[in-house]
Each structure stands twice: as structure tokens, then as C-alpha cells.
From Swiss-Prot:
One of its GO terms (molecular function) is alkylbase DNA N-glycosylase activity. Keywords: DNA damage, DNA repair, Hydrolase. This is Putative 3-methyladenine DNA glycosylase. The keyword Hydrolase applies. Its EC number is 3.2.2.-. NCBIfam families: 3mg. The keyword rRNA-binding does not apply. GO terms for biological process: base-excision repair. Gene3D superfamilies: Methylpurine-DNA glycosylase (MPG). It is an enzyme of class 3 (hydrolase). It holds the Pfam family Pur_DNA_glyco. Disulfide bonds: none annotated. Belongs to the DNA glycosylase MPG family.
Length: 212
């Protein structure tokens, strides 16, 4: 089938209500879409194919914000049924994009760690950015959750919104199914044994990864 014949479908919020580890693995190869308005008032859609995710699996996961039932105003959205966004700020600088997953009252989510732009999106994004030093011409420009949200202009205004086109951020499926490998999660040395759990899902050997 020619690339022009590939048909994408919008992933429905109910898709995210499945087990979190399944969602995290199945997101590899999916397309994260971001609708933006340029300086001329024109709408554009940036598309990033997801190459790396991490699963956070609830109160028994010491790396999860809701570990041991830590239910706070910030983490409340994690108790929602899968299909909404959980975005938070880390180190006072970087926004982290999480897709809430699993059943209601089970605080779980998938962190989007890395991806790469497709279908002319690099050109569209560079038109959006006036500073040539910020232009996204390299395969690793979205390699890392902070770089990713900065590049796609995602912040906490997305918190709690449904994962649908109405929120201007959504996921599409065009049938891409790459080989997926499992690795330990990154940056969670505080999490005891949980830091060794194989809950980071990567597109095997893809150059866009934040870490192989």
C-alpha cells in the first residue's frame, strides 16, 4: 500500500481504559497529533510518531505519583478512567505529558517520553518557530519528555482534558506496529525495587529514543 493510501483513525478515549502496560506498549508507533494556530491565524496539525513510553501502574508502584494512596489535588485526575491527560511541571521547568490509563479509581498513566515528527510536520513546526536555533531538524529534537512538550507547545492547560481532537491533542492509529523492547524506567532512583521494573517501552533501536 502506498503511503498516500494509508488511512489513520482517531483513537477513542475508551482505548486508554485498558491495562496500562498494554496501552504503553501499543502506543509505540501511534501518532500524537497537536493542533496549533500560527501567527497568521491559520490552523496546522503537527504529527509525532511515538517511539518511547513509560508505564506508571498505581499505588503499588513506588515511582508513581499516587504511590501508597497519595491522593492530592495534582494526582486526582489519575483516578479518572483512562482517556484524559495528566500534565505536570517538573523541576519548575519541564512539562510532562501523561495519558491516564486503566479503570476508574486505579491511579495509572503512561508518560510519553520520545517521538519524531512525520508528514511534513518538521517544516510546519519550523514555520511556527522564529528562532532558527529552536528549529526541529534533528531526529533527537523530541527525544525526552521535556523536549517533546516544549516542541509541541504542551503545558498544564491540557490537564484533565479528554484525549480527543476537541482538546487539540489526540492520538491516531495508522496501523504502524514496530518491534517493541522493554527497559527499566529513567530517573527514578528513589523508587526502590520499582526502578528495575521493565516498564519503559521503546521502538527497538530507533534513533529518536531518549535512551536505548
Amino acid at each position: 500500500m502506498l503511503a498516500s493510501q494509508v488511512v489513520s483513525s482517531v483513537v477513542k478515549p475508551s482505548w486508554f481504559a485498558r491495562p496500562t502496560c498494554v496501552v504503553a506498549a501499543d502506543l509505540i508507533g501511534k501518532v500524537l497529533c497537536r493542533e496549533l494556530t500560527d501567527s497568521d491565524g491559520q490552523q496546522k496539525i503537527l504529527r509525532m510518531r511515538i517511539s518511547e513510553t513509560e508505564a506508571y501502574i498505581g499505588e503499588g508502584d513506588a515511582a508513581c505519583h499516587a504511590h501508597a494512596g497519595t491522593r492530592t489535588p495534582r494526582t486526582e485526575i489519575m483516578y479518572h478512567i483512562g482517556g484524559v491527560f495528566y500534565v505536570y511541571l517538573t523541576y519548575g521547568i519541564h512539562h510532562m505529558l501523561n495519558l491516564v490509563s486503566g479503570p476508574t479509581e486505579s491511579p495509572e498513566a503512561v508518560l510519553i517520553r520520545a517521538g519524531f515528527l512525520i508528514e511534513g510536520s518538521a517544516r510546519l513546526m519550523n514555520e511556527q518557530l522564529l528562532d532558527v536555533n529552536r528549529q526541529l531538524n534533528h531526529i533527537k529534537q523530541l527525544a525526552g519528555p521535556g523536549k517533546l512538550t516544549k516542541g509541541l507547545q504542551i503545558d498544564r492547560t491540557l490537564y484533565g482534558k479528554p484525549i480527543t481532537p476537541a482538546s487539540k491533542v489526540w492520538v491516531e492509529d495508522d496501523g504502524c506496529q514496530p518491534l517493541v523492547s522493554l527497559r527499566p524506567r529513567i530517573g527514578i532512583d528513589y523508587a526502590g525495587d520499582a526502578k528495575e521494573w521493565l516498564l519503559r517501552y521503546i521502538w527497538t533501536d530507533h534513533p529518536s529514543l531518549s535512551k536505548k
